[in-house]
Amino acid sequence: MNVLLGSVVIFATFVTLCNASCYFIPNEGVPGDSTRKCMDLKGNKHPINSEWQTDNCETCTCYETEISCCTLVSTPVGYDKDNCQRIFKKEDCKYIVVEKKDPKKTCSVSEWII
């Protein structure tokens, strides 16, 4: 079991370094136990094969062996940083890009990253 857990931790670290938009949390317990649930980082329990959205704008899925969480937020990177600024709207889980001098005017964005 320790070897499996160690492998999952190494895999999760590798995935995080390659693609920081998702991460995995090992789901400890006995495989095949259908009464098992996943416990998220806040201590909430979720049924196996369920999906939920976190307060941090992530969507998480409970699997038998792990919880997989991925960001819902795309970050603007291709915009005029001298004249525009990005503002995060947590209630919508998205960024908007507006002019610094007149925040009522939006700026065009050519590139986004997840």
Swiss-Prot record:
Tissue specificity field: Strongly expressed in prostate, liver, kidney, breast and penis. Also expressed in pancreas, esophagus, stomach, deodenum, colon, trachea, lung, salivary glands and fallopian tube. PSP94 is expressed in lung and breast, whereas PSP57 is found in kidney and bladder.
Pfam families in alphabetical order: PSP94 (PF05825)
Localization per record: Secreted
Signal peptide annotation: 1-20
Gene Ontology CC annotations of this record: extracellular space; nucleus
Tree of life domain: Eukaryota
Keywords: Disulfide bond, Secreted, Signal
InterPro entries registered for this protein in UniProt: PSP94
Record-annotated disulphide pairs: 22-70, 38-62, 57-93, 60-69, 84-107
Disease tied to this protein: Prostate cancer, hereditary, 13: A condition associated with familial predisposition to cancer of the prostate. Most prostate cancers are adenocarcinomas that develop in the acini of the prostatic ducts. Other rare histopathologic types of prostate cancer that occur in approximately 5% of patients include small cell carcinoma, mucinous carcinoma, prostatic ductal carcinoma, transitional cell carcinoma, squamous cell carcinoma, basal cell carcinoma, adenoid cystic carcinoma (basaloid), signet-ring cell carcinoma and neuroendocrine carcinoma.
Subunit structure: Homodimer; Interacts with PI16.
Similarity-based family: Belongs to the beta-microseminoprotein family.
More about this protein: Specific receptors for this protein are found on spermatozoa and in the prostate.
Protein name, per record: Beta-microseminoprotein
Organism listed in the record: Homo sapiens
Lineage, uppermost ranks: Eukaryota, Metazoa, Chordata, Craniata, Vertebrata
